[in-house]
Amino acid sequence: MIELRDLSYSYPDGTPALRGINMKVERGERVAVIGPNGAGKSTLFLHLNGILKPAAGEVIIDGERVDYSKDELIKIRQKVGIVFQNPDDQLFSPTVREDVAFGPMNLGLPEDEVEERVAESLEKVGMSGYENRAPHHLSGGEKKRVAIAGILAMKPEIMVLDEPTTGLDPETADGIIRILLELSREGITVMISSHDVEIISQFAERVFVLNSGELIAEGTPLEIFRDAELIRRASLRLPRTADLLNRLRMAGFEVDVKLTVEETYHELLHLLGGDAYHRLLHFLGEEKQHRLIHLLGEKKYHELLHALKEQ
């Protein structure tokens, strides 16, 4: 579906931005590209539909090398849709309807089909009824949804979203991830970039790690976040669940790293040994007990302690 071969790119001042990137994303996959700010994630994504042209290497879409001719770029941009990190870079029409209709209208589609695509796209992102609102009056999360709808209206096969949850509160960010998961279930290939490790386990099937313009690792979320040294080298942090279990493991507890709260709860419940209740409280101390309550929720935390005490 998408393949990058030895892709390199430098900024106009000569500073290297991407160095020899090799990456392959299959049809229908959910992929995350993670790395710290300045790792090259946004620059990488701008190569996926021809906004940027590599200094060296190739971009291959559906087995065909992108040749950057005008006709080729039009075709690629119908197939690969990019949602920018800042929705204000993408929303410029007086109303939501006009913004979402912009792409289909430029394809020369009949008016009734344009209206159908607008209605369908807004419904998918939960923004039906906002057609006549001004985009600049919307909240950050609403703007992000409208920006996604504008790309959906083009009916792309591949959705590429640069930092889709940046600047959003947790509830709004979770809503964006739910939209992307639903699009994946419909068969759309979805790629996101992020330096927020917490959303990766909710979303990704495969993770690529970028640092200083180089691809330094690839694997499942669990494979990536089990490697605490890799995460340190990439100037990231472990998800809270993985960090807790990794700290417990380093303290001598026989636990395996998990990513979800439910898996973490059961790992603590079933794998801690007979004197685990007292060992756990001693290890945590008051401050870390509060962190564990925040992580698991108060009910599950007390269920866990009760179960350990009964062992």
From Swiss-Prot:
Biological process according to GO: cobalt ion transport
Assigned keywords, A-Z: ATP-binding, Cell membrane, Membrane, Nucleotide-binding, Translocase, Transport
Database matches in Gene3D superfamilies: P-loop containing nucleotide triphosphate hydrolases
Membrane topology: Peripheral membrane protein
Record: residues binding ATP: 35-42
Superkingdom, natural source: Archaea
Cellular compartments annotated: Cell membrane
EC number from the UniProt entry: 7.-.-.-
Domain annotation ABC transporter: ranges: 2-237
Reported function: ATP-binding (A) component of a common energy-coupling factor (ECF) ABC-transporter complex. Unlike classic ABC transporters this ECF transporter provides the energy necessary to transport a number of different substrates.
Subunit structure comment from the entry: Forms a stable energy-coupling factor (ECF) transporter complex composed of 2 membrane-embedded substrate-binding proteins (S component), 2 ATP-binding proteins (A component) and 2 transmembrane proteins (T component).
Protein name: Energy-coupling factor transporter ATP-binding protein EcfA
Biological source species: Methanothermobacter thermautotrophicus (strain ATCC 29096 / DSM 1053 / JCM 10044 / NBRC 100330 / Delta H)
